[in-house]
């Protein structure tokens, strides 16, 4: 399965984009959840609050399909 993960901010540093400043192309074997993909990439699950794919809000148990573009959103912080 080939997919594209997008993010900004501190999460982008962990994502290590390679397509453009915000996007990383990822190939995974099998039917993995987003949580499992993050684990394979070494991205701490706590850095992702939620994700968007196909115009819908997705949880980390979402299973991306071939060609999906998934935008990862970090937790909101500030003061």
How does the language model describe each region?
Residues 1-78:
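Ubiquitin-like/PB1-type beta-grasp interaction modules and other compact soluble beta-rich domains
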